[in-house]
Amino acid sequence: QRALAGEVWRACTAAPSKKGTRLFCQAPTGIGKTMSALFPALKAMGSGCGEKLFYLTARNTTQAAAEDAIARLRAVQPDLALRSVTLTAKEKACLHPDAEGHPACLPEVCPYANGYYDRIKNALAALLDGSGQFSRAALADTARQFTVCPFELGLDLSEWCDVVIGDYNYLFDPVVHLKRFFD
């Protein structure tokens, strides 16, 4: 754990541009990789090295581990001013009853897409006044309440978050690449 935490710290603080470098790590399950990566990265952000942390994984269980680690950090330091969002694939996040894994993201077809930009401000305000940790369930609940697309809500909310948790395809896949952050 200590060696990994040190490497994460060095990767986050090494570059003169204060943007850090990329660090890819692989280790067995259960050794504390999540906290060993998150804690020094967040500490580096607090020192002015970077504005946003992307915790990208291949599995939902690892995303849940990152959410849990952030919740534990909040429990230890309740006044921690940290916002995190977990992004979910559009197919999994879609609330349209007729979508069945194939989102129909057209305003003419989907009530969550129709008028999205008329309602998004209120949905974001409601979330940003809350806990600061935004899971898939929290996004879905807010999306239902304000009738907005939960996938787009998560993307828009990510602009105000310090930590973005999601699938690594958001970085590597040109089809779902997060252009707002990685272009």
Segments and roles (model prediction):
Residues 1-25:
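Conserved pre-motif I regulatory segment
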Residues 17-39:
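Walker A/P-loop
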Residues 18, 29, 49-164, 168-172:
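A substrate-engagement module of RecA-like helicase motors
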Residues 177-183:
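Short, conserved "post-DEAD/DEAH" coupling segment immediately C-terminal to helicase motif II
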Residues 37, 65-69, 177:
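Residues at alpha-helix caps and immediate loop-helix transition turns in enzyme cores, especially N-
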Residues 3-7, 36-40, 167-173:
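Well-ordered alpha-helical segments embedded in enzymatic catalytic cores
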Residues 9-13, 34-49, 70-73:
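Walker A/P-loop NTP-binding motif
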Residues 1-5, 30-37, 62-63:
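Phosphate/oxyanion-binding active-site loops and adjacent basic polyanion-contact surfaces
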